Structure formats: C-alpha cells, structure tokens
Amino acid sequence: MKFLLLCVLLGAAAAFDDDKIIGGATCAKSSVPYIVSLNSGYHFCGGSLITNQWVVSAAHCYKASIQVRLGEHNIALSEGTEQFISSSKVIRHSGYNSYTLDNDIMLIKLSSPASLNAAVNTVPLPSGCSAAGTSCLISGWGNTLSNGSNYPDLLQCLNAPILTNAQCNSAYPGEITANMICVGYMEGGKDSCQGDSGGPVVCNGQLQGVVSWGYGCAMRNYPGVYTKVCNYNAWIQNTIAAN
C-alpha cells in the first residue's frame, strides 16, 4: 500500500505516512529562504516560493484555504522574520491522480505579494532536468523518526542524490511515472517523511522536486519519490499568466 508523505497532523496523529526529514540536520537560519510552511491552524505541508506571489507545493496537500508562512525557521516561535499571507487561489494540476499520485503538483497564489529579503526569497524553476547523481537539498519540518514520531520546531536540511530511473523503478515496480523522480539513499537512513510533503528539492540552485510519496520513511530499498518539476515549467508559467 502506498503511504503518502502527507504532513497532516491532527493532534498527535498523522493521517498518512508523510515525509519528514530523517538523517538530516538543523538548517542554518535563513539558509532556505524559499521554503514556506502551509498552515491551517497547524503546519501540514511545505512549499516553495517561486515568485513574490506564487508558491509551488504538492497537489495532495490541497486545502481550499491556506495560510502561507514565509521566513520561518522555528515554527513554534515568533523570530521577527515571518510573513503570514493567506491564499487567494489554490490550483491543483488538472491531471492529478490521488491514487497514483501522478501530477502531484499545485500552485498557491498569495493574497498579497511577499516582501523579499534575506529571510524570504524565491527559488528559480529548473532550466532543464537534473541528471542522476546530482546532489540536492531537501528541507522541511516533517517527522525525524522512521519509527515513531518527532516533529521538530527547527527547519531540517538533508543533502541527497537523484537516483537513476532503474533504481527508482526497481524500488517501486509499475508505480513510477515520467513525472516522478527518486531522491535519497537505497540503503535507507536518510529521507523526507510525514510533514515534509510539498516541500522543495533544490539541485544546483533550482527547484527540481516536490516532496510527494514513498513507502514509510528512510527504509532500505524504498527511497523518497518526488514530483519532477522540470516537466511542469510550461504548466506553471501558463497557470500564473492566466491567474
């Protein structure tokens, strides 16, 4: 059965096996200025700021109304760098399939533009698709344990490589579409997890992945699966232009 990396925390219970960072370390403050926390009274997913008014996240993180929290590091404290902006539009890809998680991508329009500064900034969309072996930065406030739960207040970072299509398909036979990539370690121990869903995978300074799904978290032979953002440049640009 497919366990989604959905950071849906209802009290102490996660509704799905969501992706959170396991095996990483606390990020340096403001070192990931493009990451946002999606909030509906609690942090439930991540996202990436791509313009001063648009955020990319995962379609499985959809809610009709979202508060986007920018400039966050410690999500339990007010640190003076935060901007909280409500969504004015939340647009899932029309081809999103909630069973296969194909086209697991969505755009959020902010009700007002963010103020860009050292703590809040955009990440470029990909100029092309990154090759297997490329090292990428994954970040989020998701679960840090593969067994049990520990949701950190401080943003976590993990460097991990893009895996080959062969490795990805061998881990998940028949489940990987052309719109997915695997990132991580076949030996396990380092991965995204519940609560990281929708968050960024940035390779060579460009947004190449969105945290999507996986079997458990950080399990041997089951790397994390991510939406392949380089396939969606036209959809992103056209959607922004039309809205």
From Swiss-Prot:
Any one cellular-component term (Gene Ontology): extracellular space
Catalytic activity entry: Preferential cleavage: Arg-|-Xaa, Lys-|-Xaa
GO MF: metal ion binding; serine-type endopeptidase activity
EC number of the protein: 3.4.21.4
Key words, A-Z: Calcium, Digestion, Disulfide bond, Hydrolase, Metal-binding, Protease, Secreted, Serine protease, Signal, Zymogen
Active site: H60 (charge relay system), D104 (charge relay system), S197 (charge relay system)
Residues the record marks as site: Required for specificity: D191
Annotated Peptidase S1 domain residues: 21-241
InterPro entries per the UniProt record, alphabetical: Peptidase_S1_PA (IPR009003), Peptidase_S1_PA_chymotrypsin (IPR043504), Peptidase_S1A (IPR001314), Serine_Proteases_S1 (IPR050127), Trypsin_dom (IPR001254), TRYPSIN_HIS (IPR018114), TRYPSIN_SER (IPR033116)
Propeptide boundaries: 16-20
Needed co-factor(s): Ca(2+)
Organism domain of life: Eukaryota
CDD domains named in the record: Tryp_SPc
Signal peptide boundaries: 1-15
Disulfide bonding pattern of the chain: C27-C157, C45-C61, C129-C230, C136-C203, C168-C182, C193-C217
Similarity comment: Belongs to the peptidase S1 family.
Name by which UniProt lists this protein: Trypsin
